[in-house]
């Protein structure tokens, strides 16, 4: 999925660059991987903050009623009151279940976004590491070749000419 997303972003790069200032800004974000990573991390933090604010700012009216009522007294003679209280309690439980379900869904979305950010981060670092490792191994390989060449020449310059064969 991430590979398809990267392919899509690469194919849209030219189109975005020619579509105006917003497209040019998006093309610039795509071309610089660390800035893209920082942008995704900022989106992750923003979405986390929005989930917390959504929960704090929007208390539902049944929940407020449940907070203001005191503990009910048990009267076996008053069955109608007990049924109403049971309905209120069931409504509160249903509300709690809905809130918990929304929070868990939001948490799952945040985890998925976080995983995508880390996948991109690992791909960026893997490319950097592989290029460093490739350059380092080339340098090491060159020095070995030179060492072997010099050792071969030094063997050929010894007194016995049979070592060169």
From Swiss-Prot:
Gene Ontology CC annotations of this record: membrane
Keyword terms: Fertilization, Membrane, Signal, Transmembrane, Transmembrane helix
Transmembrane segments annotated in the record for this chain: 26-46
Compartment annotation: Membrane
Phenotype when the gene is knocked out: Male mice are sterile. Spermatozoa show motility defects, lack the typical hooked sperm head appearance and fail to penetrate through the egg zona pellucida.
Coiled-coil positions: none
Tissue expression as described in the entry: Testis-specific.
Keyword Membrane tagged: yes
Cited InterPro entries: TEX46-like (IPR038788)
Record bears the keyword Lipid biosynthesis: no
Signal peptide as annotated in the record: 1-24
Annotated membrane topology: Single-pass membrane protein
GO BP terms, alphabetized: single fertilization
Biological role: Essential for male fertility, sperm head formation and sperm penetration through the egg zona pellucida.
Name this polypeptide is given: Testis expressed 46
């Amino acid at each position: 999925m991430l590979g398809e997303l990267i392919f899509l972003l690469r194919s849209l790069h030219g189109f975005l660059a020619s579509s105006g200032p917003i497209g040019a800004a998006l093309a610039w974000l795509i071309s610089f991987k660390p800035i893209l990573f920082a942008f995704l991390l900022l989106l992750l933090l923003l979405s986390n903050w929005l989930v917390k604010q959504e929960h704090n700012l929007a208390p539902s009216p049944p929940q407020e009623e449940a907070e203001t009522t005191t503990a009910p007294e048990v009267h076996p003679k008053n069955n109608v009151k007990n049924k109403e209280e049971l309905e209120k309690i069931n409504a509160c439980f249903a509300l709690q279940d809905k809130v918990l379900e929304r929070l868990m869904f939001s948490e799952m979305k945040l985890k998925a976004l976080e995983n995508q950010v880390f996948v991109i981060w690992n791909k960026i670092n893997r490319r950097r590491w592989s290029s460093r490792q490739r350059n380092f191994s080339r340098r090491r390989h060159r020095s070995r070749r030179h060492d072997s060449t010099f050792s071969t020449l030094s063997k050929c310059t010894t007194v016995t000419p049979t070592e060169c064969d």
